[in-house]
Amino acid sequence: MPAKYRALIVTFLAFHIDTLLYYFLVPLLPHYANKLRFSSFQIGILFGSYALALLAATYPAGRLTDRYGRKKPMLWGLFGLMIATALFAWSTNFAWLLLARCLQGAAGALTWVPGMALIADHFPNEERGRALSITFMGANLGVFLGPTLAGYLATHFSYRSPFYVGIILIIIDTLGRLFFVEDVVNVEKSETIPIRCLLGHSRIQVFMIAMMLATVLWSFLESVLPIYLDRRFLSTPQQIGWIFGFLAVMHGLTSPIIGSLTDRIGRPTVLRLGLWAMIFLIILPSWMPSSLAVGLLLGGIGLATTFIISPCSPGVAAEIEQMGSRAYASGFSMLSFSYSAGMVVGSFLGGVLVGPLGLSVSLGCLSLLCVGLLVFSYQVEAHPSLN
């Protein structure tokens, strides 16, 4: 099998297992809340700690990946994920669970950053968008399957059983990273790109803001819509799960298609199409007449999210190549930083906006953020000297 397809399989599996294990915790929250007497504040801290650890670890992960290659950091990440998963299975107090969640976030950075860099190494610019989107489809499959599998195992066996299955999956993932991953470049220390160069590049700024904005929108909806659906339509937990599952499925299934589109018509064009759609779609959930209508609308939002996210990784890789470097991980660490920051900001906005402003006005504010990025994107394209 060609090396690039081995890299694609390993990265697909890595992203899938990382996301699957992240979402294992969702159906187990009632257990922690009831049996271990955790407060809603502690539950919120558990979720937020993952994003904060991911946020803190992303740039160091990029520097390590560009210095030591892709394979070693991916294996280090699995070691941390193994410890975190074992802690989840056996922890009986908040402190150990918090440590597990932080380790899981740091391990995620050592999976995503070198994983994206591995794909960029093996696939040329004209194939990179589709390849990266296929790996993201693995992550979205984890979003859909994680809560379902964990809920089934916890119901029919024990609340520890999902994490035992997780350890088995990590072992399989380890074998793949050990024997299938091949580093095709050795990036020397002198070739790493200073962070100020990345942050000062206007096109990279556009892609970073786009990644953060898409994650803000997603996290905002996850934090406020379940309560809205419960109160307005009396939706059951299962119905809410299917509604958000449809969002994840639409995003995941369309990723390879939109990824190929970015390779054909250009990353900025695809990004702007997504922003134009999101400007109008994001204001509509509070106007839907039924939970079914909300679910169908979320499918459209999932598709628009794909248009926004898919151009980001291959776009950053292309800009790094134009700088005369192959230090992709440094650029991808900035995207991962934006992603994790978006998780934190989206949940925060859901908590502070909806109460005083209401859902409709809050969604209108998010639409204005999309307008702002769209204007900035056109400005950057109209003034190439900014790059």
Where are these regions (language model features)?
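Short amphipathic helix-loop junctions that connect adjacent transmembrane helices
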Residues: 28-40, 224-238
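Paired small-residue
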Residues: 84, 95-103, 292-300
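Helix-breaking motifs and short loop linkers at transmembrane-helix boundaries and internal kinks
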Residues: 37, 69, 90-96, 234, ...
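Cytoplasmic helix-loop-helix junction between adjacent transmembrane helices
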Residues: 100-138
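Intracellular juxtamembrane helix-capping segments at the cytosolic ends
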Residues: 111-123, 308-322
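Juxtamembrane intracellular "pre-TM" segments in multi-pass secondary transporters
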Residues: 1-2, 182-208
